[in-house]
């Protein structure tokens, strides 16, 4: 059974997921032998992915994102901004893959531009979907994308974004991934001329690594 929640902001969703996994997660060892605690099929809908408050951390692009960062969290500032920008860049920057490269260059088609084109042509389109998984390459590799799919829908003048992760490091990666997704959604919404709506993140395997158990326990005490 899926664990589904609605939250106002990205940081709220991250904290609730950390709490859920530390309380109810089942211990699982992954392919590399790392011990994790895991909850299957978590679905988090973020109602205000761009944030609102003046004292939130600011990321400047074409517009201003006001996204709250968990206090003391290691993803913040310039590091978080640069990571978010990778969602829009087709350059792999020396990595085996990046999400931006898979979305914009890897398959020989710019899926992001095509999604925007479809939404401009038909605001009710159900075809503005992008994928990262490359079966011929990824079935033979140990370094494969965790985010598999991103989908955009325009409803009631707002852009609703849904993304699927096959595997999600909740303590170490969920928050920056969600910020990167918000960055991506903000770009698409601006190109199409609509407001950013809810973002929904479905994590098939939502887990926390043993190396982060202590930090995660501290989050629960907040």
UniProtKB/Swiss-Prot annotation:
It comes from Methanothermobacter thermautotrophicus (strain ATCC 29096 / DSM 1053 / JCM 10044 / NBRC 100330 / Delta H) (Methanobacterium thermoautotrophicum). HAMAP family: Thymidy_synth_arch. The active site is at 146. Monomer. Belongs to the thymidylate synthase family. Archaeal-type ThyA subfamily. The lineage of its organism: Archaea, Methanobacteriati, Methanobacteriota, Methanomada group, Methanobacteria. Pfam families: Thymidylat_synt (PF00303). The keyword Methyltransferase applies. Keywords: Cytoplasm, Methyltransferase, Nucleotide biosynthesis, Transferase. This is Putative thymidylate synthase. PANTHER family: THYMIDYLATE SYNTHASE 1. SUPFAM superfamilies: Thymidylate synthase/dCMP hydroxymethylase. It is found in: Cytoplasm.
